[in-house]
UniProtKB/Swiss-Prot annotation:
Entry protein name: Glutamyl-tRNA(Gln) amidotransferase subunit D
MF-aspect GO terms: asparaginase activity; ATP binding; glutaminyl-tRNA synthase (glutamine-hydrolyzing) activity
Taxonomic path: Archaea, Methanobacteriati, Methanobacteriota, Methanomada group, Methanobacteria
PROSITE patterns in UniProt: ASN_GLN_ASE_1, ASN_GLN_ASE_2, ASN_GLN_ASE_3
Pfam families noted in UniProt: Asparaginase (PF00710), Asparaginase_C (PF17763), GatD_N (PF18195)
Originating species: Methanobrevibacter smithii (strain ATCC 35061 / DSM 861 / OCM 144 / PS)
Family to which this protein belongs: Belongs to the asparaginase 1 family. GatD subfamily.
Amino acid sequence: MTYKEIAKKYLENNGITIGDTIKINKEDISYEGILLDRSEDSEDGYLVLKLDSGYNVGVAIENTQAELIQKGDKPKIGYGAEDIAHDPSKQNISIISTGGTVSSIIDYRTGAVHPKFTAADLIKANPELLDYANYNVKALYNILSENMQPKYWVEAAESIANDISDGSDGIVIAHGTDTLHYTAAALSFMLKTPVPIVITGAQRSSDRPSSDANMNLIDSVVAAKSDIAEVSVCMHGSLNDSYTYLHKGTKVRKMHTSRRDTFRSINYEPIAKIENHSVDINPNYRYTKRNENELEVNSAVEEKVGLIKSFPGICEELIEYHIDKGYKGLVIEGTGLGHVPDKLITPLARAHDENIPVVMTSQCLYGRVNMNVYSTGREILNAGVISGRDMTPETAYVKLSWVLGQTNDIGEVAKLMNKNIAGEFNEKSSIKYFLN
């Protein structure tokens, strides 16, 4: 049980454990349902119940009374799972869980959610997977994706490299969707891979009829068996269950809070469409083929990099603060072609003079930075700011973090930021990329 001090004591005092059916009375309202577990990094003082309607509700336990309605059964996840036979005719796929909706299994007898599971558990929840590959499944960590940190990218990259070295024919990463695109970019810079690395997630939990978890996971396995030996993201391509898209790891972004087709290629096209569990590679895309590269890992990152959005009321002190606090690099989300108010030029120049690289991106997301058009842009360039070209702010942030892990020489940083390492920017823009 992952409930913490306050909630844990509350449950113990009332003789309640995960899977029990309980009633929580609070003032003039009550909630009845099955007590669910919570993720390891959830806030203390709350319980989560699965109601008869199928929806989950979080209840603050302050000033409440708990009533045990019925004891629950022991969870069946991970218990008595029969061995899954290895099929030598099939490829070996590693599935690595980092937490998130897609990698959780619901035990309907207890209502418990299990983000840590075995290969047998995964097959029980998604039996169609047996048609595609043999599996090695492990939980790397169990966090909500908003709590992702650069050090976890390093752990993921090294875990992936170990699996590839051990003979895995493809990798699937199960990840929460909120920061999935950051991780996709990070792995793109950290790894040269001889096999596909596919990151997937889910917008709807697997206990909901509208869940996208099963299809995304199966299509990710299909992509991991393909010839595209790159880091990519596999998610729904439409609101229904007709197909998924494969997006380049450095050119993808979450663009909607709740839609199942939230992930879109930015300043790029999807690199493949997966329909009826078959991969149709974009004929315009020149991809790295399986075994074309030897495995290389360069996972060092600098964690103290800032991402700052320009806005009409922004003041010089915001830039000065990051300099004074010892930040090693800054990415600016400028307006339009890559602009900030002219009052920021002096602190930006100070950053450059103190060997703190600054990279300019655009809030527009689509299109590219061009600081040669207007006088303010030219002054920004003269202050030593590096163009982020058509990278998304998130990809530029990840790249700068990675580059600073390789070198702290500001001249070398500029060279690497202007070098296309993982397809993170286009040399030319195309009108077909806008809102594709």
